[in-house]
């Protein structure tokens, strides 16, 4: 089920690191089509196996901190424009633990907005964290392409550093193999629960808006397949739509303009009782405005949060209450209801990107002090719930589709859906049929299928 494109791209990145060429070798969006990847299937299989074996169970050899021992934690996140919540989560961690340069423990950096075209920069920024002799853990959120290669190199030079991968965008097994902990949104259960939530909110159709690059991300491709299957089971119509990829030359403004111009006609075509969903953060803002104006349905963002798209879509000022999630939710709810979204628009009450960032820091601090286990699901849940008073979380392990076994260091998290004007839907209590956890996809086929969907993707 692994994507050949994703696996080969990750392997090439690992090879560049191993031979010391990361600093000079250009890696671009067309790397998957380079001649070096046209080797025989037998050679590819052998290289694949070798890379997997080289990283399997290659976990941190860290020691518990001594009382009063100085240490640092590295945080690499998206920028405000690509993922504000993760960035704000890093700011919260700095506020709580202090900057390393000012006597605290947090060393913070961001990867480029056009990370697909600047993979080398991402790798170098993550690797640079390990140059700090006091560094004990490195957390990346979101873990964009290049994270696996950087973690692999860090493990070779600094086996004592804990490596935490949040919201990964690379191959599941490779990500698991090079990380001490991986945490991602439970896109398996959410694939079903979001469609069920949409039906509870009155939807008769579910429209999935994305672009081919995102369908090359295994977890997103699986979730899309689950959503389509859930629509069949719940007697709803599944609609596949394209929008431009903001990381391409069209940029964020161009992609947002396209969606803003097309959401109205799509609502007119498919009807107000259609739930619209996009896999991209930057596209969320125009989608929310369009859904509210057209009276359609929006269950929750891809990376759910009351500040994911809502403030910018509806000009909501929240600077004076940043980090106060109950207060943020209250203000956003009032504005959304005023805009016509009562009972038709939702979110998670607390941001996934924000919560996962600060919760991961808290967890790592406890692990380094011998108070928690990095892969213990109860400890992970405790760290998340400590940041989200009143909201329930479901935490489980990712399943390795190749052998049906759980990946013990790969945690999936899900928070209950909050509908404005109605409250929590109780979605974390909804049982998800085991068949959805076993749905397999051919990622290459999914990419081609997306290219054939309605709309422009570049």
Where are the model-predicted features located?
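Periplasmic-binding protein-like
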Residues: 73-77, 132-144, 161-166, 207-209, ...
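Flexible loop/hinge segments that line or gate small-molecule binding clefts
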Residues: 153-185
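Extracellular/periplasmic periplasmic-binding protein-like sensory domains
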Residues: 231-238, 285-369
